[in-house]
Amino acid sequence: MDNKENKLDEKKIFKNNKIEEKKENLIDAITVQNQKIENLKLKLLQNQKKINDIELRKLANIENIKKNTEEKIEKIKKTEIERFLKSIIPVIDSLEDILNLSTTVDIKDQPIIKGIELTLESLLNILNKLGVKIEGQKNKVFNPDIHELVSRELSKETLPNHVISVNKKGFTFNKIVLRKASVIVAEN
């Protein structure tokens, strides 16, 4: 019976060894699978980070495009406004020339001249409301940024380097010189 018992014990041991071996193989397989899962999780996190970075870059790019577009639109607006304002200056000159001529030929009190005066006044008021400034007032210090020197003359009434008279008004808009005022300046 010992022999039978030994064989049974051997079978049990063999069976237990097989079970242990299967357990170990199963544990190894689970460990490998867990490692694969961890690697996949890590890759997923990395990919999510890449996607987030790409999304942030896209948003930043969209904001930059929006900002650049707004700046370009503003620049175009300013350029077109400046161009428009420069085109009005000759009209102002013409109206002023008519008014100056009307005093010379003594038709200053004619209704049409009054209409021209009102038109010029309205136009200058509108430009003033838009931010256009008239440059070239008498007795102001000569400024080469806004004045164009026509000539210098001796003057007892005006301080040296100050405007004696204005041949043509100058105009500025938002610190942009649309036209320099043509002026005569007092000498020292």
Curated annotation (Swiss-Prot):
GO biological process: protein folding
Molecular function as annotated in GO: adenyl-nucleotide exchange factor activity; protein homodimerization activity; protein-folding chaperone binding; unfolded protein binding
One cellular component (GO) term of this entry: cytosol
Domain of life: Bacteria
PROSITE patterns documented for this protein: GRPE
Principal location class: cytoplasm
UniProt KW Cytoplasm keyword: yes
SUPFAM superfamilies linked to this entry: Coiled-coil domain of nucleotide exchange factor GrpE (SSF58014), Head domain of nucleotide exchange factor GrpE (SSF51064)
Pfam family, one: GrpE
Subcellular location: Cytoplasm
Keywords: Chaperone, Cytoplasm, Stress response
HAMAP family linked to this entry: GrpE
UniProt similarity note: Belongs to the GrpE family.
Function: Participates actively in the response to hyperosmotic and heat shock by preventing the aggregation of stress-denatured proteins, in association with DnaK and GrpE. It is the nucleotide exchange factor for DnaK and may function as a thermosensor. Unfolded proteins bind initially to DnaJ; upon interaction with the DnaJ-bound protein, DnaK hydrolyzes its bound ATP, resulting in the formation of a stable complex. GrpE releases ADP from DnaK; ATP binding to DnaK triggers the release of the substrate protein, thus completing the reaction cycle.
Complex and partners: Homodimer.
Protein name as it appears in the record: Protein GrpE 2
The gene coding this protein: grpE2
